[in-house]
Amino acid sequence: MTRAFDTPLETIGQVLAGPWRKPVNMLLTQSYDDHLSIHDDAMANKLGFKAGPIEGPTHFSQFAPLGEAIWGERFLAEGCLSAHYRNMVLEGEDVRAFIEREPGEDHARIWATKRDGTEVLKGTASIGPHAPPSALDLRLNE
């Protein structure tokens, strides 16, 4: 099978791990209608944060090679990620994405951590219309 990504992946038991990445804050200077985003350092500082956090879709992109390695192109066409962000990541911090699924299942557990073990996000990945409730579904029903 030809893979869409040449990302080096590591298998640890039933867990598939991506490489350590240093995401870049692509929204650092984002503004709309003269409103600064939380991703802007100045606004983040006003709110008491050290710097603007990396945006969520950047973290989601770390899961594309993992989902594609498990489910192939089907994940790219009809895959779903659902996650609860637990801690912010600032530019320059290392982040690693993980996915764990039972063989043959159409859903999996996902999470990402910083190098020091801090949880960045946790949730679910799935393909197709018959996957069990996503992380968001479960959270909304708490």
Which residues does each predicted region cover?
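Hot-dog-fold acyl-thioester-processing enzymes
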Residues: 2-78, 132-142
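HotDog/MaoC-like acyl-thioester-processing domains
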Residues: 1-28, 85-142
